[in-house]
Each structure stands twice: as C-alpha cells, then as structure tokens.
C-alpha cells in the first residue's frame, strides 16, 4: 500500500507529450506506485474524446485537433485554463468510476462555493455548471484499475476558441470562466484551491510537491 500523493507541477506544455507520458505512467505503474496529480496549462488544442463526432468540430482554424483516448467528446485546452490529470489507483482508494467522477465534480463545486459561486453537476453530462453554462469539463480513462486524464477548469482565458466547436458535443452550450464570476483569476490560485479540496477527504499521509515530468515517462521525439 502506498499512501503518498505526488502533486506534479508541469507549467505550460504542449498536449501530446503530456498525454503520452500519462499513458506510459499508467502502463508502467504497479500496486506500489504512488498516485499523482499533474497540474498543467496547455498550448491551444482541441481534443476529441472517444465518444466525439466530427460534426461537433465546426471550424478549428489554426488550432490542432487531436483524437485521444479519454471518455467524452470534443473540448478545448488553452492558456489560462487549469488542467489537472488524476493518475490514481482507484482500486487502492476503493473507488468506483462513478465515485471518482463525483469526487472530482464535488471538488470543483466546493472550490467555487468558497467564492460564492453556485455550481452544480449534471447526471446526463459530466462536468460542472453554473445555471446552464459550463465552467469545467471532465473526461477520464480507466486502465488496469487506474485513472488518467482529468478536468479542465476555465479560469482566465481567451474563450473564443470554444465557439469553433460544440463543447462536449452540446450544441448551444455557453462556456464560462471563474474570472468573470469573481472567482479565481489566476492559474495558481485556482490550482491551489482545487487541490486543497480534492485532497482534504482522502487518506494520503504524505503529499509531495514536484515539478516537471519524470523522464521515465517522456518518449523521445
């Protein structure tokens, strides 16, 4: 049993190397591997999940589109958006997939509540919403009883690229961000708040901060 959690700050990164590192980490881990949260800000990219449909990518323009192995449909990542990847042994945590999704959604809801933002989850469409507007997207993959991929919380970003897609396959959905609701207006503030809430109800006895990707999981280009 490993009750250590590593919080890995990656800074700003292109999407594909981080995605491939997640896959490599998950493939190599065993029952003794510590869980990790990867905290990252991505260069502009559209990612199309396994349930995605081409018609939901309306006009990507100069932003690349990458087909990925997470659940869900198309979303946008870019500067000013908080992305956290959850590399967790959910069997060891005694979590089911739905429990993990609920925990992540509730983490964001509780974080926003600290700023008097009334957010909620929807059973029919994963993520976090304020009224009918979406502020946080969520997509996971489970392999060998372990999760990867994660959440994307809009903090202080250029929202225009969302108009080039039907976010999460939802036509007409409005995407919003925390800055415009008197919530966190910086990446670091949002990251600290979300991580605090996520870890508060889990039983990790040792939480370590690290920076950068471990080279064992970085594929040579």
Curated annotation (Swiss-Prot):
It is found in: Cytoplasm. InterPro entries: aa-tRNA-synth_II/BPL/LPL, BPL_LPL_catalytic, Octanoyltransferase, Octanoyltransferase_CS. Its main location: cytoplasm. Coiled coil: none annotated. It catalyses: octanoyl-[ACP] + L-lysyl-[protein] = N(6)-octanoyl-L-lysyl-[protein] + holo-[ACP] + H(+). The record marks 134 as: Lowers pKa of active site Cys. Substrate binds at residues 70-77, 137-139, 150-152. Keywords: Acyltransferase, Cytoplasm, Transferase. One of its GO terms (cellular component) is cytoplasm. Disulfide bonds: none annotated. SUPFAM superfamilies: Class II aaRS and biotin synthetases. Residues 31-206 form the BPL/LPL catalytic domain. In the reaction, the free carboxyl group of octanoic acid is attached via an amide linkage to the epsilon-amino group of a specific lysine residue of lipoyl domains of lipoate-dependent enzymes. NCBIfam families: lipB (TIGR00214), PRK14342.1 (NF010922). This is Octanoyltransferase.
């Amino acid at each position: 049993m490993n009750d250590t959690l590593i919080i890995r700050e990656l800074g700003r990164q292109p999407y594909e190397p981080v995605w491939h590192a997640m896959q490599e980490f998950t493939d190599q881990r065993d029952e003794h591997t510590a869980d990790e949260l990867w905290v990252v800000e991505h260069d502009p990219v559209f990612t199309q999940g396994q349930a995605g449909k081409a018609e939901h990518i309306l006009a990507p323009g100069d932003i690349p589109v990458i087909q990925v192995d997470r659940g869900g449909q198309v979303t946008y990542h870019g500067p000013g958006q908080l992305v956290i990847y959850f590399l967790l042994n959910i069997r060891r945590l005694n979590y089911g997939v739905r429990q993990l999704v609920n925990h992540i959604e509730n983490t964001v809801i509780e974080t926003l509540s600290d700023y008097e933002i009334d957010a909620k989850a929807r059973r029919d469409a994963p993520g976090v919403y304020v009224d009918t507007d979406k502020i946080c997207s969520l997509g996971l993959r489970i392999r060998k009883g372990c999760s990867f991929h994660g959440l994307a919380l809009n903090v202080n970003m250029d929202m225009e690229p969302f108009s080039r897609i039907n976010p999460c396959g939802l036509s007409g959905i409005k995407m919003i961000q925390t800055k415009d609701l008197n919530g966190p207006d910086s990446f670091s503030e949002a990251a600290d708040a979300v991580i605090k809430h996520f870890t508060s109800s889990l039983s990790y006895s040792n939480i370590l901060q690290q920076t950068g990707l471990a080279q064992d999981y970085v594929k040579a280009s």
